[in-house]
């Protein structure tokens, strides 16, 4: 189940693409855009990530940090980040614990097949660590700009 506006965002510590530990608490006093994607280097998620990359300075000017997260291992995330020149942390939750805490890991259905996976969801977390916005219907090409327009 997804988190709701006003909920406290669960803290986490996960490795990023470089194997460095990143915690939500590292960003206290800043808003955080936390976007989840099913798999690194796939077309839709690449477009979504490029949007955040291209608008990175605008997010920074609003005192906001961007974090991406999937269940990919750091080595795969690193290739993805390096190829796309992503300037923001891409987190790796291979155990799915944080993905579960945020309600984005669960049963999915596609073409008559059921499997466990990550839902495409983005949260905006306030400076105080509360869920400020929930995006569960994402348009990959315009998602970053849609968030900027909302804030």
What spans do the regions from the language model cover?
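Chalcogenol-based redox active-site neighborhoods
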Residues: 1-151
